[in-house]
Design a protein with these regions (language model features):
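Short, basic, low-complexity termini and linkers enriched in Ser/Thr/Gly/Pro
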Residues: 2-28, 33-37
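A sensor for short, sequence-defined functional sites
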Residues: 43-637
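Sec/Tat signal peptide C-region and signal peptidase I cleavage site
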Residues: 38-42
Length: 637
């Protein structure tokens, strides 16, 4: 009963001690009370048992047995009732069964292997992998659903299944166990994240090595605002062989250097292009003076002649398609497109490096090399005094722009000498700039013409890329959500892109910008930052405050006072400084105009959870300043 508060445990004990209940009634009572209590604490499920048992009998073959039993407490946990497992021609589902029990332990549904469905992928995808799945909607709550299945894997043991019994917020774990049995001569490495327990290594009666890990009573994680991503908080264990055989290739994962040697063996020789294409590339670039200009020309060619398509073929999806094939077909995945760009650069004499990276994990395990930590490939181009990082799956991005999914991430640079652990650059907080110039022409009835000129740079630029492809109607709807202008009518709206900057130039009319009361106008000082909210109070916050990306918002606002009105009340200048950021607000009258300047710098970083009340106060002050009004009064004649 460790999941329940002490007073609830005591009440349960007293009821059970004094009541005459059958075994089934006791079980039902406990299940119902458990569900009610956990529902009151917003928990949606309990993993009763999560078991992974891997039996590896050689470098090329393993049987993986899984058992998952989960009690789903309410509708919020309904998706946890579904079953899904990844398969391929080398990972076969050989056994499956499932069952659903109600709160009394009565079996209300059995699930057969014949009921599983197989995913149907788009015909445009070149892919070997598929998924077997079953979707189940609980008829009542709570219910317990149990799945057991077996995967037979051969010729692809570059790593063993990860152990991650906790996969979502508001889900606790009662018991979880992982066991890996392997030949003694097969060196197996492991790494633990967010786990205090240790892996036990022993030998069984047959002389095989046995690695085992047990976890119990894991509390549910809460989805708290401004906290680390869930994937960085989950308990997780990695297991992988040091030396491997993978789809007929041989390699080592002793360290990242050895991993890089194997990766290089997959791409070496795949960058050859036909002579006719090479001549075309020289015609395109020979007259250009600098390497950067040549790279730009080839990057634009990549954009115009290729498109992204997922390709999970060739050495388990790890080997890129030959550059000549990508050139001919016009499509490829991140591996194929990056390799094709590498090939074009090589033709014109510019060296580059193939780089593997994760778009989800900012940090790789420096002392534990494994393929599964990465899910993406980009290209690195060393230049004198600079290094370009090319995103080849989306060449619509400005050349060399390091987008949010990879900025600051660890990566592995692959070359003939092996893998090198590197980190991509991240833009300074102040470089993620939104600069707004606004003029508000107010009339005596509270109506206003608002001209808006906004520049979005870098990280803020990424958020508004969708504007570039929207039609006029959708652009207008988006702008209306961005601004604090009641009854906004968008008259004109232009959207321009220049490198990693998007500019929005718009004219907005409002018949009720200011509120009229008698002889007074109450005028909002800031027509933008709509929806700026403060986080909720959390008395028992679990996580430190995490601000992944900092930014700078600068506003220059000019308000023209209507003829016949004078200022009765005006906000005072304010400056707010905290570890998380700084905010300054200034306002002054210049003739018939009021000039307002806002500057908010949010600082990326991790801050102790004890500072959360201070953080809320900081955000409330900013929200309050943005919401201030100037009071205008009709002049006395």
């Amino acid at each position: 009963m460790r999941h329940l508060p002490f007073n609830v445990q005591r009440s349960m004990f007293n009821v059970l001690r004094n009541a005459t209940l059958s075994k089934r009634e006791r079980s039902m009572f406990i299940s119902i009370l458990l569900a009610v209590t956990l529902h009151a604490t917003a928990q949606k499920a309990v993993v009763e048992e999560s078991v992974v048992d891997v039996v590896c009998d050689s470098r090329t073959h393993a049987i993986q047995n899984f058992r998952e039993s989960t009690t789903i407490l309410n509708e919020q946990g309904a998706s946890l009732a579904h079953f899904v497992c990844s398969c391929s021609k080398n990972d076969k589902l050989t056994a499956f069964k499932g069952q659903v029990t109600d709160s009394s332990g009565r079996v209300i549904r059995k699930i057969k292997e014949s009921e599983l469905q197989r995913t149907e992928y788009s015909p445009y995808l070149a892919i070997d992998d598929y998924q077997m799945f079953f979707e189940y909607t609980p008829p009542v709550y709570p219910i317990t659903i149990t799945y057991e299945w077996t995967i037979d894997s051969h010729d692809n043991l570059i790593e063993f299944p990860r152990f991650c019994p906790q996969t979502d917020y508001d889900v606790s774990v009662k018991k979880a166990a992982y066991t890996l049995t392997a030949p003694k001569e097969l060196a197996v490495r492991h790494a633990l994240l967010n786990i205090d327990n240790t892996v036990n290594v022993s030998e069984n009666a047959k002389g095989s090595q046995v690695l085992s890990l047990e976890l119990s009573d894991l509390p549910a994680l809460k989805d708290e605002p401004y906290s680390r991503p869930l994937r960085e908080r989950l308990p997780m264990a990695y297991f992988a062989p040091t030396d491997f055989t993978y789809y007929g290739t041989q390699g080592s994962l002793k360290d990242w250097r050895e991993y890089g040697k194997w990766e290089y063996s997959l791409i070496n020789g795949s960058e050859v292009l036909p002579d006719a294409v090479c001549q075309e590339l020289h015609q395109l670039t020979d007259a250009l003076k600098t390497d950067r200009e040549k790279i730009e020309a080839l990057y634009q060619r990549l954009e115009k002649t290729t498109r992204y398509v997922a390709v999970l073929l060739g050495i388990g999806g790890q080997k890129p398609a030959p550059a000549a094939n990508v050139c001919k077909s016009g499509f490829g995945d991140c591996k194929g497109l990056s390799n094709y760009m590498r090939a074009m650069l090589k033709v014109v004499g510019i060296p580059s490096n193939y780089v593997t990276i994760s778009t989800t994990n900012r940090q790789l395990l420096k002392d534990f090399a494994s393929v599964g930590q990465m899910n993406h490939v980009i290209l690195q181009v060393p230049l004198q005094g600079d290094t370009l990082w090319l995103e080849c799956t989306n060449p619509q991005l400005p050349m060399g722009y390091v987008h949010d999914d990879i900025a600051g991430h660890n990566a592995i640079e692959v070359s003939e000498t092996g893998g090198r652990f590197v980190q991509l650059p991240v833009y300074a907080d102040s470089a993620n700039l939104m600069h707004s110039k606004i003029h508000i022409q107010l009339d005596s009835k509270g109506a206003a013409d608002v001209s808006l000129l906004q520049d979005f740079h870098n990280w803020q630029y990424e958020h508004y890329i969708p504007l570039l492809k929207m039609d006029e109607k959708d652009r207008h709807k988006t702008l209306q959500r961005m601004i604090r202008v009641p009854q906004a009518e968008i008259g004109r709206m232009d959207v321009r892109e220049d490198g990693a900057t998007i500019t929005v130039d718009a004219e907005v009319k409002s018949q009720r910008y200011a509120t009229t009361t008698g002889q007074r106008l109450f005028v909002p000082i800031c027509p933008i930052h709509n929806g700026y909210t403060t986080p909720p109070t959390l008395p028992n916050r679990q996580e430190d405050i995490y601000l992944e990306a900092g930014y700078l918002d600068k506003d220059e606002i000019t308000l023209t006072i209507p003829e016949g009105y004078e200022i009765e009340a005006m906000p005072k200048d304010q400056t707010v400084e905290q570890p998380f950021g700084t905010f300054s607000f200034t306002v002054k009258r210049e003739g018939s105009e009021v000039r307002i300047q806002n500057s908010l710098l949010m600082k990326s970083g991790t801050y102790d959870k004890s500072q959360y009340p201070q953080f809320i106060d900081f955000m409330k002050k900013i929200s309050g300043i943005y919401s201030q009004k100037i009071v205008l009064r009709q002049s006395k004649s």
